[in-house]
Amino acid sequence: MLTFGGLSRGMMESTLSNALNTLTGHIQIQTLEYRDDPVIENRIENPDLLKTMLNKTLPPGTKWAFRIQISGVASNARNSEGITIVGIDPDREADLSFYGDNVSQGRLLTSGDDHGIFVGQALMDNFETKLGRKLVLITQGADLKTASRAFKIRGTFRAEMEGTEKQYVFITLAAAQKLLGVDTAVTSACIKLPEGKNLNITDLTAMEQTSRELSRELPDGLTALSWGQLLPLLKGYLSMFDSFMLLWYLVVFMAMAFGLVNTMLMAVLERTREFGLLKALGMKPLWIIRNVLTECLILLILGLFAGNLFGFATIRSLAGGIDMSFVAQGSEFFGMGHIVVPFLTVKDVLAINAVILILGLLVCLYPAIKAGRITPVEAMAHI
């Protein structure tokens, strides 16, 4: 149960980390309309004012950057596909997302490289092109007319999911602003808060409280959204995770309970004469029940001790991670990375041990009560 719990927790953490690393961040600042309609018309017109406020408000160690993120089409002589155009500050973006994590070919974008583009390896393969070749981006500009521009491929990246490689293309923020004709405007500010004892990204309540406090400081027309608000499906999955795990522990324990009851019943039946003799000597049924439950408790504690040692040893042996690439399509469906590192929290260990200990004693009540009801006459008749 510890091993399964650790693996499940690792899968959940992998899914969450991958989602936040795919351009979501911990908190995003957008206009009120952008989330429902992510087009360039719903942009932040005066980012300088927002920049000043963020530099004063955010805690030390926070990473943040402006972005332009819109839908568009990538095209060359061989192919064309719908993609998401992401205008970034190359110097800041590497600290916020998967950008720069795994460069497959070429190099990253640099500040001032307004004619370069950084694409996924899968996208470049689909377009049958190579480094140095041009890729045309087509989208709708701020004037509602079609805007297009050619960029040279500077490099390619590998991502945890092939779909990510096909979806996102990166250009500099200045290049995106020029393409769309929006001067200094941006569509969002992505924020990555420093994690520590006062902040845990899996603590949805604390994260949403932080975003609400930030929203109160923002200029009119802007809002701060936590990753839970940006990814409601993932938020729902995580909120059900602990309940799902507890239910799974109960199911596994039900299978274990049959073996435990069988063991205790055999022990009671084999000691029928002993219990009958104790009854004849005046021992009360409640004392016999207490003795049987005490024996059961000792067995459970010994079993938990051995099981915990084995579970911790197994998780420790998998500390380097489990390569899930053999089920790559399945892991991509759930948004997991290719490497899952099992781990347990103190809460997980306590929950598993509590379920086994409490339910184990409840299961042992039947053999204990049966032992308490044995009479001296029944014991004498027992061979």
What would you call each of these model-derived segments?
Residues M12, L16, L231-W248, V268-L269, ...:
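Alpha-helical membrane-interface segments at transmembrane helix boundaries
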Residues G5-T84, R107-D113, E213-R216:
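Hydrophobic, regular-secondary-structure patches
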Residues L265, T272-A319, A351, L359:
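Transmembrane alpha-helical interface segments in multi-pass membrane proteins
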Residues M1-R9, L238, D242-A280, I288-L293, ...:
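A hydrophobic alpha-helix feature that marks transmembrane segments and, especially
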Residues G141-M245:
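Mechanotransmission and gating elements of multispan inner-membrane complexes involved in transport
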Residues F305-A351, L365:
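Short helix-loop junctions at transmembrane helix boundaries
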Residues L344-I383:
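C-terminal membrane-exit region of the final transmembrane helix in multipass inner-membrane proteins
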Residues R67-I70, E81-I88, N102-A175:
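Hydrophobic secondary-structure segments that place a key small or acidic residue at a functional site
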